[in-house]
């Protein structure tokens, strides 16, 4: 059974990236401003996840994940070392 954290990682893998080289200072963050953010491309609304959905059973979360993956655009990858961007 997948933990809630693993489910969030699967759904929002776009928000995580592999950890950079250790030479980078750990508390240094990339500053993002409006000029770095463009309009969405190939956007397809596949579902809505609300804050109360984290209280759902693992079976229901897996069903939602499967439904979203069936819509396309979701790839499963094995990511070992992550940090939030």
Curated annotation (Swiss-Prot):
Gene3D superfamilies: CRIB domain. It is a lipid-anchor. A lipid is attached at residues 14-15 (S-palmitoyl cysteine). Keywords: Cell membrane, Cell shape, Cytoplasm, Cytoskeleton, Lipoprotein, Membrane, Palmitate, Phosphoprotein. It comes from the Eukaryota. Residues 37-50 form the CRIB domain. Belongs to the CDC42SE/SPEC family. Probably involved in the organization of the actin cytoskeleton by acting downstream of CDC42, inducing actin filament assembly. One of its GO terms (molecular function) is signaling adaptor activity. PROSITE patterns: CRIB (PS50108). PANTHER family: CDC42 SMALL EFFECTOR PROTEIN HOMOLOG. GO terms for biological process: regulation of cell shape; regulation of Rho protein signal transduction; regulation of signal transduction. InterPro entries: CRIB_dom, CRIB_dom_sf, SPEC. CDD domains: CRIB. It is found in: Cytoplasm, Cytoskeleton; Cell membrane. The modification Phosphoserine is found at residues 78, 81. GO terms for cellular component: cytoplasm; cytoskeleton; plasma membrane. Its main location: cytoplasm. This is CDC42 small effector protein homolog. It holds the Pfam family PBD.
